[in-house]
């Protein structure tokens, strides 16, 4: 354990950090726009085409989740699970506009603010919130204001650091509020599966299970040298997190040089539908970030990793700057074609670089229908 005199620890213990996470964001926005969809299973993603469509689920309503449907599921499988669901295409322009409105509300409640995606953000309130009792009331005000102005719900986690507040926000979804005081952090974290710790993906979870580590408490109490031997530097970091120690500060704005997303398949696959569908979802996420930041790009990069862990990247630079999602899709699929039919894929990723802020006075060719 770090010494009590460590200034970072003292700062972390004094902090009250909020994590605000919109509930089933894309689907909730669609229901807001079309109230007749309320209480129906709504799935946002690719066209299912009678169960033979390509692509994956972007998000779905909580009613759809009752059928076992979840994000990143192949859209054809979602159709088989619930053929009567309402399937809608991704409308990133609509979601980006709502996101901007939500984030503006949250900034009004924050002394420090960090948006981390189109539908979630961290904030630290001002000095008027002096303890966790006041923080709970403050969180209710945030939730009420988002509901009043945007007509959608969010879940809020409150804790002494980013780690705890992030996990807490997912505890009572949808429309939830979970407050974890510093003295309750271990009681809150220890019963959880290790997969709830950020950074513990499927492969890391598998490694930990082979070590006999299934719950956060077991990770917290594991010998750090043993963890380091199995996981390298990440082992020490995971032990810290399992003990509720997170000294990461909120970063209000960083200079963005690139935007990328990657995803690892649950099982290595050579199924072109799964590969292209997952890539399509990653592209939509990249494009959402582009729109959020009002960026144009000039270079598209594809990353693939095969079952033997060999990794390759391919890039293509355009002659003009653009923000067109179809340019990303067309280029990425062309780059992907070089690798299809070789081996099983373990990971795919896509990114854009050579970014610049869009001048709103400009009119791009892609702005016209």
Swiss-Prot record:
E.C. numbers: 2.7.7.7
Assembly and binders: Monomer.
This protein's record includes keyword DNA repair: yes
Family, as annotated: Belongs to the DNA polymerase type-Y family.
An example Gene Ontology biological process: DNA-templated DNA replication
Transmembrane regions: none
Function: Poorly processive, error-prone DNA polymerase involved in untargeted mutagenesis. Copies undamaged DNA at stalled replication forks, which arise in vivo from mismatched or misaligned primer ends. These misaligned primers can be extended by PolIV. Exhibits no 3'-5' exonuclease (proofreading) activity. May be involved in translesional synthesis.
Pfam name, any one: IMS_C
Gene that produces this protein: dbh2
Main EC class the enzyme belongs to: transferase
GO-annotated molecular function: damaged DNA binding; DNA-directed DNA polymerase activity; magnesium ion binding
Catalysed conversion reaction: DNA(n) + a 2'-deoxyribonucleoside 5'-triphosphate = DNA(n+1) + diphosphate
Cofactor or coenzyme needed: Mg(2+)
Residues reported in the UniProt entry to bind Mg(2+): 21, 119
Identification of the protein by name: DNA polymerase IV 2
């Amino acid at each position: 354990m770090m010494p009590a005199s460590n200034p970072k620890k003292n700062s972390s213990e004094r902090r009250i950090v909020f994590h605000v996470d919109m509930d089933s964001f894309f689907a909730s926005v669609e229901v807001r726009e079309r109230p007749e969809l309320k209480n129906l299973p709504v799935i946002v993603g690719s066209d299912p085409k009678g169960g033979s469509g390509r692509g994956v689920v972007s998000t779905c309503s909580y009613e759809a989740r009752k059928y076992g449907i979840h994000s990143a599921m192949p859209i054809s499988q979602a159709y088989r699970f619930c053929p009567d669901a309402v399937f809608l295409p991704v409308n990133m322009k609509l979601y980006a506009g709502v996101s901007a409105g939500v984030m503006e509300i949250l900034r009004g409640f924050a002394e420090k603010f960090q948006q981390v995606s189109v539908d979630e953000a961290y904030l630290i309130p001002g000095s008027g919130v002096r303890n966790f009792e006041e923080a709970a009331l403050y969180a209710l005000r945030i939730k009420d204001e988002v509901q009043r102005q945007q007509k959608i719900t969010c879940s809020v986690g409150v804790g002494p650091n980013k780690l705890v507040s992030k996990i807490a926000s997912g505890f009572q979804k949808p429309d939830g509020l979970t407050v974890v005081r510093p003295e309750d952090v271990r009681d809150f974290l220890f019963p959880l599966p290790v997969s709830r710790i950020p950074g513990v993906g499927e492969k890391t979870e598998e490694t930990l299970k082979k070590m006999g580590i299934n719950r956060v408490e077991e990770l917290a109490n594991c010998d750090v040298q043993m963890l380091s031997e199995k996981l390298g530097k990440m082992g020490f970091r995971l032990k810290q997190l399992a003990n509720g120690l997170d000294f990461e500060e909120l970063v209000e704005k960083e200079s963005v040089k690139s935007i990328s997303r990657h995803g690892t398949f649950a099982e290595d696959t050579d199924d072109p539908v799964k590969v292209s569908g997952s890539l399509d979802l990653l592209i939509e996420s990249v494009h959402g970030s582009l729109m959020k930041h009002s960026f144009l790009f000039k270079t598209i990069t594809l990353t693939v990793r095969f079952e033997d862990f060999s990794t390759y990247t391919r890039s293509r630079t355009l002659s003009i700057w653009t923000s067109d999602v179809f340019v990303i899709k067309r280029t990425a699929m062309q780059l992907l074609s070089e690798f299809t039919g070789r081996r099983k894929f373990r990971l795919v990723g896509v990114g854009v670089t050579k970014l610049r802020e869009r001048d709103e006075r400009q009119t791009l060719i892609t702005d016209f229908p």
